[in-house]
């Protein structure tokens, strides 16, 4: 059972800092829980975690992702979190972060704003109902019944849910300046900072997504994002050569986002795990370091001429 406080502050940043880092709000994955986030080392800032308030009763969200986002906005406001925040999460948590950020663009004078998105192995999403068959997920029978029911409820939503319609790239698609590993980089639009396994940061070119914005569409600019990408595919119990649903873009640096969505991911870090063991004990120290690297990028990221 999760704490009644929702969101719950799971880390507190240093009170001695002259300029306190932007707080981070992490959103649960499809399990509905936030236990994995409690296991992380210090992220050097205030960190909050939102669990699914429907978890204990296994109640599905009848209004889908839109209802969830609206409710979580109220939770963040009620917790007294104000001003600029970073928003993110593992897997489904990344999708919810993007949905919340999109909902905020339609609110006049919101009490908080999303200045960056942290995606932890959240691949580009296409509704399951529109995709060809894929390999089954691993056997989850060893997990508690409430967790398995939560997986089932979110699978139903993901079967038809589509990503919110952002119409403009992050930071107006301008060349940016940001810090990573204590160094400063200048990164042009259409390029990202990328850290492959066992290597340092590289400035690499990505595929471009062409979005013909209609004059009738509202200009909705994405927040910049940083991505943790699992480098391994999920082991399966079958002889199928098809990947699991979450591994459809495993071979791509940005997990399918660059060729299917307006440009918003500014940095990507590879981690030598698969989607379902990224938070296991032996991987936590490395993952914490990599998350801090991504947070450094998001803290420092700004268009040339503005920083």
UniProtKB/Swiss-Prot annotation:
Disulfide bonds: none
Keyword Hydrolase found: yes
Effect of inactivating the gene: Decreases significantly the production of KK-1.
Cited function: Probable thioesterase; part of the gene cluster that mediates the biosynthesis of KK-1, a novel cyclic depsipeptide with 10 residues which is a promising active compound with high activity against many plant pathogens, especially Botrytis cinerea. Within the pathway, kk1J is not essential for the biosynthesis of KK-1, but plays a role for efficient production via correction of peptide chain synthesis by kk1B.
Taxonomic source organism: Curvularia clavata
Keyword Hydrolase in annotation: yes
Functional pathway: Secondary metabolite biosynthesis
One Gene Ontology term of the molecular function aspect: hydrolase activity
UniProt xrefs under SUPFAM superfamilies: alpha/beta-Hydrolases
Family, as annotated: Belongs to the AMT4 thioesterase family.
Assigned keywords, A-Z: Antibiotic biosynthesis, Hydrolase
Record EC number: 3.1.-.-
GO BP annotation list: antibiotic biosynthetic process
Protein name: Probable thioesterase KK1J
Induction entry: Expression is positively regulated by the KK-1 cluster-specific transcription factor kk1F.
